[in-house]
A protein has these predicted regions:
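Helix-to-loop junctions at the C-terminal end of transmembrane segments
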Residues: 61-72, 158, 321-335
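Hydrophobic transmembrane-helix bundles of small-molecule transporters
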Residues: 160-276, 309-310
Length: 467
């Protein structure tokens, strides 16, 4: 069954949201060292540039579906796209850290509005099951391609010489894309029907955002400030308040009032194990890019462009593996995921061997990143399927939103813990690796331990095949 030109136009326009979100999630990883040098930022400042983007996005995910039903999916998609475009302009014109952080937070919040509505509009536009499946496949492919493009542009754009402070291009490039997409969606995408569903209060999401910031803030600032007493008190207080908040939401659900979460989901053992596996895995995922980008540029004297190209090989390995694994998983189930985790662990240990020299061979680096990408591509696409596969159909949408929220928050924890270890560890050699810094060695070791935890959780899942 073929798509008409107008079908491809709709898919392209409604995939622009996820394209821009993923681009800006990955483009920043390679360009962070350049931004840090240009704006004279501290180590914790660079962590906030990523974390505020992710928390802003995650804070709206759970309520996004309900908001789209009440206010209109097209309307929220346009508001999110416009907000993302304006925030990108703010980031590109930033003259100080606080202006950049404000822009990144608004980028994240805007993404939380537009990304869920984009995929919801695609499912509404294509009633035919075969066309819908093909459209969602294209949507997913665009997100995967965006991650590779983001890494490449994050390396190439900061090295441009025809403009001063060329790192600004990584944000300014979004402005024409977002502006054209807004106009085209307004003109060509049909308006969806608004349901009579009552809007949920956004206060629980605001409360959740504040509590998460209360947990993340001391984890980021504590190591840099030598853990003053206030940071420890804030962390303990935030954890206690977070537990009380969850208990309050559970009590509301039992009384029949709207709740932030559907707690019946957590009666499913497979879902719980899948969430824990995702929590550990995604702590490693984004931290890997940030650490290796920083290490290659600041310790091994790679340019941003060379670093971006190296990460393209990781992306190619990921894409190729994910295509092959989608077929193998149906026959071999969780064994494929465990095999992928083994490749990732072996890849991380190989980093310590290959990087143990002052003069890196680019071909070895490319092969190493490609190998690690194969491991990622064997694991990541199946994790969500593993977590959701035993849920009743009526709970899959809610379970997906919770899974995606945990995914984003796990990335924040990875940046706080693993990247924090890398940035704040004193520079000495790592045991008998004379040309590996202790910071890189300990961060890599922590990543390996977390991946071993993922493998342990996966082995606890039932052995039936994934459908």
């Amino acid at each position: 069954m073929r798509f008409q030109i107008k079908d491809l136009l709709h898919i392209s326009l409604l995939s622009t949201g996820i394209f821009l979100f993923v681009i800006d999630l990955f483009i920043i990883n390679v360009s962070l060292p350049t931004i840090q040098h240009s704006l004279q930022l501290g180590n914790s400042d660079t962590q906030w540039i990523i974390i505020l983007y992710i928390i802003g996005y995650a804070s709206l995910l759970i309520n996004a579906g309900n908001a789209g039903n009440h206010f209109g999916k097209k309307k929220l998609y346009l508001i999110g796209m416009a907000g993302f475009t304006l925030a990108s302009l703010v980031c590109g014109l930033s003259t100080n850290l606080y202006m950049l952080l404000a822009g990144r937070l608004i980028q994240g919040i805007s993404s939380g509005l537009m990304v869920p509505q984009g995929i919801a509009l695609i499912t509404l536009l294509f009633e035919n099951k075969e066309k819908k499946a093909m459209a969602l496949g294209i949507y997913g492919s665009i997100a995967g391609i965006a991650s590779v493009i983001g890494q490449l542009l994050g390396g190439i754009l900061p090295d441009q010489t025809w403009i001063n402070e060329s790192w600004r291009l990584i944000f300014l490039i979004n402005v024409p894309i977002g502006s054209l997409a807004c106009l085209a969606v307004y003109r060509y995408t049909p308006k969806d029907q608004v349901s009579g569903e009552s809007p949920r209060s956004f206060m629980p999401m605001v409360t959740l955002f504040i509590l998460l910031m209360g947990n993340i803030f001391p984890l980021i600032m504590g190591p840099e400030l030598q853990w003053p007493l206030w940071s420890l008190l804030l962390l303990v207080t935030a954890i206690v308040l977070f537990i009380l908040f969850i208990r309050k939401q559970r009590a509301l659900e039992k009384m029949g009032y709207p709740s932030l979460l559907n707690f019946s989901l957590f009666n499913n053992r497979v879902f719980n194990l899948g969430l824990l596996a995702a929590l550990a895995y995604y702590m490693v995922q984004d931290a890997y890019f940030i650490i290796n980008s920083n290490y290659l540029q600041n310790q091994k004297h790679y340019s941003a462009t060379m670093t971006g190209i190296a990460f393209v090989y990781q992306g190619i390995g990921y894409v190729l593996a994910s295509i092959v694994v989608s077929k193998l998983i149906q026959r071999h189930g969780k064994t494929v995921v465990l095999f992928g985790l083994g490749i990732m662990i072996l890849g991380l240990l190989s980093h310590l061997i290959v990087f143990n020299t002052m003069l890196l061979d680019p071909h070895q680096v490319h092969a190493l990143f490609f190998f690690y990408g194969i491991g990622c591509g064997s694991v990541l696409p199946a994790l969500m399927t593993l977590a959701l596969k035993d849920l009743p159909e009526k709970l899959v949408a809610v379970g997906s939103a919770i899974y995606l929220t945990v995914q984003q928050l796990s990335i924040c924890l990875g940046i706080a813990f693993i990247v924090g270890v890398f940035l704040h560890q004193k520079e000495t050699t790592f045991f008998f690796w004379q040309d590996i810094s202790s910071a890189y060695g300990y961060a890599t070791t922590l990543s390996v331990i977390l991946l071993l935890c993922v493998a342990s959780l996966i082995t606890c899942l039932p052995s039936e095949k994934i459908k």
